[in-house]
């Protein structure tokens, strides 16, 4: 796991007074789900899953349940908003850098065709 993701997870779980683990207890599942959905806006579902030692299908499941969770799962929305804020801080820059790298590669390839 890269340092940005590790730092993101530490900053996310600290105010929730949770230590990330693989428990199926509601507070852990809720926190994990909210963070996975927020991270999936900046990373592939496979990358998100790997950062939690989970398969991408877990991220797909949580993403699909997100809207329902916002309305029916007490505390989920607050966790999600915290996760979004932290992801925008920690992951947005990386996402932009990756896109710029791809564009630079495409420009070089196109210049080679000219």
Q: Residues of each region from the PLM?
A:
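N-terminal globular core domains of eukaryotic regulatory proteins
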Residues: 1-8, 30, 41, 64
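Short Lys/Arg-enriched helix C-cap and helix-to-coil transition segments
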Residues: 69-95
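Basic, low-complexity segments
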Residues: 1-22, 99-111
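Short alpha-helical "recognition helix" segments of helix-turn-helix
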Residues: 46-53
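DNA major-groove recognition helix of helix-turn-helix
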Residues: 62-70
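Heptad-repeat amphipathic alpha-helical coiled-coil interaction surface used
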Residues: 37-40, 93, 100, 107, ...
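Short, amphipathic alpha-helical "recognition" segments used to contact nucleic acids or chromatin
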Residues: 27-43
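Helix-turn-helix DNA-binding helix
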Residues: 55-60
């Amino acid at each position: 796991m890269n340092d940005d993701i590790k730092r993101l997870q530490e900053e996310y779980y600290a105010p929730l007074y949770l230590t990330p683990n693989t428990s199926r207890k509601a507070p852990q599942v809720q926190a994990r789900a909210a963070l996975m959905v927020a991270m999936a806006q900046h990373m592939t579902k496979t990358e998100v899953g790997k950062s939690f030692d989970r398969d991408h299908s877990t991220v797909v499941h949580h993403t699909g349940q997100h809207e329902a969770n916002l309305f029916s799962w007490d505390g989920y929305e607050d966790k999600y908003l915290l996760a979004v804020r932290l992801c925008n801080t920690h992951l947005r820059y990386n996402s932009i850098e990756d896109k710029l790298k791809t564009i630079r590669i495409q420009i070089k390839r196109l210049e080679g065709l000219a």
